[in-house]
């Protein structure tokens, strides 16, 4: 192949690469959070009558709470006697964005029996607040700005990550990656948080 022809082929490949990259970036821009149809007020009403520690979480629904390792430990200790699901997320995490509708619906389904706590890691307050404006949840999120809590739990690198504590406060399972169906999330809650064999 002549040098001129080779340069022409390489130029064509470069143009195709630029077009593909441009289209993929446009697609990712379209995946930004969109207003959700989840009705937080109705969800909270459906959780009325939950045990006091769980009701206290619902009272702080959709809030960001500054935290450190001691605050996290206190939150878990205060939920003693109840199974706990902790979901680590960030506003910039595409898989987290895809998972939140599953978290919304399933946390309402189990919210009278299981404590749900968010862990917003490596994020900014303003971006996290905007994210929760699009994807409100019936539980608070502890803010782990520098991922110190996540690192101490051994879940510092993967987003999203979901931890399951049994009612004694013992970690039973850590799921890395997003839940894409209510059924899979519910099955893991039943098995690892509630201790019911599948």
Language-model features, listed with the residues they occupy:
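Conserved segment of the thioredoxin-like fold in thiol-based oxidoreductases
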Residues: 58-59, 98, 108-109, 114-146
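A short beta-strand-turn-helix
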Residues: 59-84
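Extracytoplasmic/secreted envelope proteins and their assembly/folding machinery
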Residues: 69-76, 100-107, 125-132, 150, ...
